[in-house]
């Protein structure tokens, strides 16, 4: 809103604009007051009406000279703020005040007692004005102080800057930078920073000055007979009931404002959400598109009722058509001349400042119109921007100039509006026509005019955002100042009362805490510039009264809001009468001549907005909106990371375009990477590793590029949760954050570790070598020879763990650096973030503690069985179990020793392996059956690419491959594969269903953005296949596949089945829990590299109750013998998956209509169960995992109750059995280690056995045994006892080392780029 800073009324007694303009910046040290030219002093006049007329004429000619000089000095200063110009302005101000003093005192001396009786009304008004001295009443020292205060207040405001946090070189001025931010930015934090910065930078230093100004100003006007400055300002309206009239007007428009406020608040709530918008509270003051929330049209795009209708903001069209500031003023001038009014004089175009200078000058940018009082020089000062809003401001300012032109021949004291509101209303009246779609079409800014109710509502809402939104602000500013001047608002309550009024009338609140150190009123130009503000409230009512009358004069038919008086000379003639009167007559008379009434009335305004008023009421009633702000004390929280994150992008449309581009490019690149990775994993070669590293680099470059881009968005207030979630995920650039040389080194370390693991083998002394798959795995599963198992166990770790150890500390350093650069405390923190839970570690510990009693009972029972097989030399019934005796390289699952621990050995077998082999099952047949299970649930069959491209068996062509089972998504929506060195056995049948579960997950979410193509959390992906495997493993289902002769029944059969399942599921729980317990502590530094292995075995002892069968040292690295450690695959996912798969199973069984024990449930062919699974899988990662959990189970939490329910019969049997045998639960003799004197270091050949340290053929060994049998029994027993004792001592002091993740297929390594 442009204030007519140069417009003057009863000069020199109207402080608002001239006095301010006179005095602006930088006060210099006081100097002697310049003397008034004697020729400008008053002469001698008679003390009668005739003498008064001569007095007035003489005053007029002298005043024009003084006023021109003072206005010129102010103009020079405002358009070039320098110390010299400030000094010259000071001198002109003092001359001005001296002139006012001598002429005012003369008027009082001669006419104070008689002027009100003059017959000439104009003369009465002139003399009454001249004898009001204002600041000229003050003694010279106080006058200098008063001028200094005005100058300093103006300096503070005009030179105020807001500097970017921690970047002092980047500072924003109010115009254009801060104004543009408030108008166009939708970044909550950035707008807040601009708002807070401006209010602090300007308001705080103004506060003490304003207090002193108030005291001096009141003292000055009291000497003129007014109670305070506010009373003087109100006197211009010549109405004893002025304040009551204003209150009446406000109540007329209040219902419309309340409906507009509620509607806008709802729209802001859609944009900013509950965090920042309370639908029953005030609106944060910075969100309404304007520094002062006085007009809201800049947020029209957020609140437009019908977005599909033509855009009524023609800013872009103005820019496209090459409009500039001068053209905007020419267009405004042409409107006035089309009404028959005056064109701008040459001086206007020659001397005005229509744009912000580009030469670096400091200027006062606030738009203002200037009268130089020589009847020909009129100017506008405006830092014009090419926008529709500024086009209205241009018409507003030119309305002031037109007023100047029309009353320029009046006495200087009458050259002002009929009242101050008149002057503000004139330009706005024309702007009401200019802003109509019809007029915008006429001047080429709108292609067509839509005549329909929706377009009308759009237009009227846009106008309401400017006009109606302003009314409470226009009303309250001087309510506050009048309270300050009268003393009702003391300095101790300046800010409190300011915000009380802003909340009371506007329904807004400060967005940050404010107190009495602040002075937020001072952040508005008119406060430090001492420009009365109620004129704007009055003008916003008057302009609609004028508009209504002029439209009638122009012959307009139809709704008032569609009226355009352009080219109506009749309307122009009517308006000219108002302008030419100046303030020579009471404003009530002037108003009556134009509109037929002498009262301010809002009925014309209400008529104009009637359609949108009704529409707003209907919308608010439909939405159940609260009118007003009953929760008036509510305040919004500060944004996270404020103010550092203020420069982030918050435009959701831009974010959406980013997401679309990221998704499009990522699909292509991730497909290429997956192909290169597949090629390497299925044919390990140097050339393949080079290609993979190159693709890895390309993925990292892409990740870094788009991750860096994603970090420019502040998603905290995005209403589109999908966009928000994608960007937050993309912001984590993972390893791509490293510098290129370090990234290359890190990738090489990962490749070297995984390759070392994948190609490793162990060899007999005769050169025969064994790979992990299938050779070593088969030995660990089937051999019951202690020494052979020990040799395999130790040899694998010697070969793999020790080779990986040199890479690992550097890998840890890089992993932590990556995590920290991505905003995490360490790599463990980064891994845990995938679960989006602050309580993850506590929740996992709780789950583990719930399952521990069952594990302890299983451990004790298995230990007793192993003791029966291996004897007390190798098994201590009160100690840990040697880690190599449990049928698996890592002792993670124990099902391979089922034959040693079967509760009821005579019961029918529940292992389908023999039947599978007899029936000629192949790996392909295994996967076909798994595919059939999924399709029986109504789920998707695997596509042809799966069968054509998967590697389902270990190649026989000599290729080195990564045998570890894994499922692969190639990100093109049709190519999904499994890589598995499948053997034909029941375990592999279960594994196949696990891997196919991953494939099904891939297929279900294939149409989501690539960022969401993963499990709801990593444990979900692992659980899906295992859920089906729980059905596949049932005797009922195996019988249906003709793999068991019967479904089996009876207690013994059930306990055997549950035991076999427990050896897989329960035995695995502590192992899956401890691996990442170890890694998290490595990452956070609590486990140092010197203690890697010791702490590994401490955890394996603590949780699993296992010990190494041979001493371990710092040179060993047993965690590295587990695939997931060198492969950098987090492992806690498997612990979680083993919990939630039973929750899923229980829920799916319920959906399938199963009745009976949970462990007997088979969901095969249940479409109802399949639908639950599909609905959860289709979500991918698009929602937080509790939502997916709720779809399947009906509740959002992880729980061990389902798994405990599943194994309840076995738990009860184990407890009874262990009590019967007096088993110790746990391992109180935790320092015990097995006697391995004979076996340690043994290195068998393929056909030879170790006998007393010699490598003999089996026949020779047997002969040797008989020869030595009788001679050596006693010695042998003694030797064994001694060796046992010595090695107990030795092993007590040995170090321990870690290993990783299950080799069996329940741990797929997901290939996500």
Swiss-Prot record:
Tissue spec? Expressed in brain, kidney, lung, skeletal muscle and heart.
Transmembrane stretches in the record are 1266-1282
Q: Is Metal-binding found in the keyword set?
A: yes
Q: So where does chloride 2 get bound?
A: 797, 1096, 1100
Residues engaged in binding Zn(2+) 1: 396, 400, 424
Give the modified residues of type Phosphoserine.
1306
Which cofactors must be present for this protein to function? Zn(2+); chloride
| Chain sites annotated for binding chloride 1 | 237, 535
Name a single GO cellular component: lysosome
Q: Describe the processing and modification events after translation.
A: Phosphorylated by CK2 on Ser-1306; which allows membrane retention. Phosphorylated on tyrosine residues on its extracellular part, promoting cleavage by secretase enzymes and formation of the soluble form (Angiotensin-converting enzyme, soluble form).
Q: What induces it?
A: Up-regulated after myocardial infarction.
Q: What is this protein called?
A: Angiotensin-converting enzyme
Give the originating organism. Answer: Rattus norvegicus (Rat)
The encoding gene: Ace
């Amino acid at each position: 809103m442009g204030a007519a800073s140069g417009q003057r009324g009863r000069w020199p007694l109207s402080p608002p604009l001239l006095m301010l303009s006179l005095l602006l910046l930088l006060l210099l040290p006081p100097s002697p007051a310049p003397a008034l030219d004697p020729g400008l002093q008053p002469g001698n006049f008679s003390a009668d009406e005739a003498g008064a007329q001569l007095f007035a004429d003489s005053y007029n000619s002298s005043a024009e000279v003084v006023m021109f000089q003072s206005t010129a000095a102010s103009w020079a200063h405002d358009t070039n703020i320098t110390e010299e110009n400030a000094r010259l302005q000071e001198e002109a101000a003092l001359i001005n005040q001296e002139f006012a003093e001598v002429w005012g005192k003369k008027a009082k001396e001669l006419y104070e007692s008689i002027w009100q009786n003059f017959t000439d009304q104009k003369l009465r008004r002139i003399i009454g004005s001249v004898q009001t001295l204002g600041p000229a009443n003050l003694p010279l020292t106080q006058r200098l102080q008063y001028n200094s205060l005005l100058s300093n207040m103006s300096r503070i405001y005009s030179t105020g800057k807001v500097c970017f946090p921690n970047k002092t070189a980047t500072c924003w001025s109010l115009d254009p930078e801060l104004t543009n931010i408030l108008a166009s930015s939708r970044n909550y934090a950035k707008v807040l920073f601009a708002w807070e910065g401006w209010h602090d930078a300007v308001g705080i230093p103004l506060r003490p000055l304003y207090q002193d100004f108030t005291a001096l100003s009141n003292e000055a006007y009291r000497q003129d007979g007014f109670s305070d400055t506010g009373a003087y300002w109100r006197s211009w309206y010549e109405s004893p009931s002025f304040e009551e009239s204003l209150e009446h007007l406000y109540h007329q428009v209040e219902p419309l404002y309340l409906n507009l406020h509620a509607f806008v608040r709802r729209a802001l709530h859609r944009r900013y959400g509950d965090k920042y918008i309370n639908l029953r509270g005030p609106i944060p003051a910075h969100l309404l598109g304007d520094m002062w929330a006085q007009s809201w049209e800049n947020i029209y795009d957020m609140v437009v009722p019908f977005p599909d209708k033509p855009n009524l903001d023609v800013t872009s069209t103005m820019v496209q058509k090459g409009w500039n500031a001068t053209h905007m003023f020419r267009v405004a001038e042409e409107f006035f001349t089309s009404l028959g009014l005056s064109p701008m004089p040459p001086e206007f175009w020659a001397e005005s400042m229509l744009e912000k200078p580009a030469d670096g000058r400091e200027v006062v940018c606030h738009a203002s119109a200037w009268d130089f009082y020589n009847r020909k020089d009129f100017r506008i000062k405006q830092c014009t921007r090419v926008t529709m809003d500024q086009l209205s401001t241009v018409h507003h300012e030119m309305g002031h100039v037109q007023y100047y032109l029309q009353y320029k021949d009046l006495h200087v004291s009458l050259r002002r509006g009929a009242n101050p509101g008149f002057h503000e209303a004139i330009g706005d009246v024309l702007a009401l026509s200019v802003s109509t779609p019809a007029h915008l079409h006429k001047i080429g800014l709108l292609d067509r005019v839509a005549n329909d109710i929706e377009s009308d509502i759009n237009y009227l809402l846009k106008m309401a955002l400017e006009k109606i939104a302003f009314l409470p602000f226009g009303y309250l500013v001087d309510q506050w100042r009048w309270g300050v001047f009268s003393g009702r608002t003391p300095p101790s309550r300046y800010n409190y009362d300011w915000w009380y009024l802003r909340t009371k009338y506007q329904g807004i609140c400060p967005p940050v805490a404010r107190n009495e150190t602040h002075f937020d009123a001072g952040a508005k130009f008119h406060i430090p510039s001492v420009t009365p503000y109620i004129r704007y409230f009055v003008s916003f009512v008057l302009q609609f009264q004028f508009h209504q009358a002029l439209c009638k004069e122009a012959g307009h038919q139809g709704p008032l809001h569609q009226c355009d008086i352009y080219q109506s000379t009749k309307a122009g003639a009517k308006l000219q009468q108002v302008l030419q009167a100046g303030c020579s007559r009471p404003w009530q008379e002037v108003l009556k001549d134009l509109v037929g009434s002498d009262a301010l009335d809002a009925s014309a305004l209400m008529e104009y907005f009637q359609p949108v008023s009704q529409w707003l009421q209907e919308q608010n009633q439909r939405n159940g909106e609260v009118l007003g702000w009953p929760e008036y004390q509510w305040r919004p929280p500060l944004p996270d990371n404020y103010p550092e994150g203020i420069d982030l992008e918050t435009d959701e449309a831009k974010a959406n375009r980013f997401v679309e581009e990221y998704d499009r490019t990522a699909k292509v690149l991730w497909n290429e990477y997956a192909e290169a990775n597949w090629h390497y994993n299925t044919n390990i070669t140097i050339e393949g590793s080079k290609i993979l590293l190159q693709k890895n680099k390309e993925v990292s470059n892409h990740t870094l590029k788009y991750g860096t881009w994603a970090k420019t968005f502040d998603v905290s207030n995005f209403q589109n949760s999908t966009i928000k979630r994608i960007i937050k995920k993309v912001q984590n650039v993972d390893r791509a954050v490293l510098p290129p040389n370090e990234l290359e080194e890190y990738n090489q370390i990962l490749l070297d570790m995984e390759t070392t693991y994948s190609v490793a083998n162990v060899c007999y002394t005769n050169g025969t070598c064994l790979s992990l798959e299938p050779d070593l795995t088969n030995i660990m599963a089937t051999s019951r020879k202690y020494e052979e198992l020990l040799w395999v166990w130790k040899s694998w770790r010697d070969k793999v763990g020790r080779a990986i150890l040199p890479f690992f500390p550097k890998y840890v350093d890089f992993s932590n650096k990556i995590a920290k650069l991505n905003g995490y405390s360490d790599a463990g923190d980064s891994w845990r973030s995938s679960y989006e839970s602050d309580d993850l570690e506590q929740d996992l510990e709780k789950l583990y503690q719930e399952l521990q009693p069952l594990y302890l009972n299983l451990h004790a029972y298995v230990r007793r069985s192993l003791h029966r097989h291996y004897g007390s030399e190798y098994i201590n019934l009160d100690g840990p179990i040697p880690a190599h005796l449990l049928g698996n390289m890592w002792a993670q699952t124990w099902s391979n020793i089922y034959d040693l621990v079967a509760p009821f050995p005579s019961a029918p077998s529940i292992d389908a392996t023999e039947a599978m082999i007899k029936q000629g099952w192949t790996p392909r047949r295994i996967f076909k059956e798994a595919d059939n299970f999924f399709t029986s649930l109504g789920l998707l069959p695997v596509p042809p690419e799966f069968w054509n491209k998967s590697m389902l068996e270990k190649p026989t062509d000599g290729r080195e491959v990564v045998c570890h089972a894994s499922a692969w998504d190639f990100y093109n929506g049709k190519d999904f594969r499994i890589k598995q060195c499948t053997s034909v056995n029941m375990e592999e049948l279960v594994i196949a269903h696990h891997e196919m579960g991953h494939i099904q997950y891939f297929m279900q979410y294939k149409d989501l953005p690539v960022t969401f193509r993963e499990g709801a959390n990593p444990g979900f992906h692992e659980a899906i296949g295992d859920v089906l495997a729980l059905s596949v493993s049932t005797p009922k289902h195996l019988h249906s596949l003709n793999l068991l002769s019967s479904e089996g029944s009876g207690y013994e059969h059930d306990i055997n089945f549950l035991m076999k399942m427990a050896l897989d599921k329960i035995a695995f729980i502590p192992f899956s829990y401890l691996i990442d317990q170890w890694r998290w502590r490595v990452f956070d530094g609590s486990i140092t590299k010197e203690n890697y292995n010791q702490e590994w075995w401490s955890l394996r002892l603590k949780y699993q109750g296992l010990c190494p069968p041979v001493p371990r040292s710092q040179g060993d690295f047993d965690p590295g013998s587990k695939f997931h450690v060198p492969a950098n695959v987090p492992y806690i996912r498997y612990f979680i998956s083993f919990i939630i798969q039973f929750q899923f199973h229980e829920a799916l069984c319920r959906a399938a209509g199963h009745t009976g024990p949970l462990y007997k449930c088979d969901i095969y062919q249940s479409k109802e169960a399949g639908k639950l699974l599909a609905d959860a899988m289709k979500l991918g990662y698009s929602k937080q995992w509790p939502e997916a959990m709720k779809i399947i189970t009906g509740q959002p939490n992880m729980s061990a109750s389902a798994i405990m329910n599943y194994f309840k019969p076995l738990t009860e049997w184990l407890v009874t059995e262990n009590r019967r045998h007096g088993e110790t639960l746990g391992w109180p003799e935790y320092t015990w280690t097995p006697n391995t004197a004979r076996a340690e270091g043994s290195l068998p050949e393929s056909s030879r056995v170790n006998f007393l340290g010699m490598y003999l053929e089996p026949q020779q060994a047997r002969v040797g045994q008989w020869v030595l049998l009788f001679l050596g029994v006693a010695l042998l027993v003694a030797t064994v006892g001694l060796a046992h004792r010595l090695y107990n001592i030795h092993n007590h002091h040995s170090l321990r080392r870690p290993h990783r993740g299950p080799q069996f297929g329940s741990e797929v390594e997901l290939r996500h780029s």
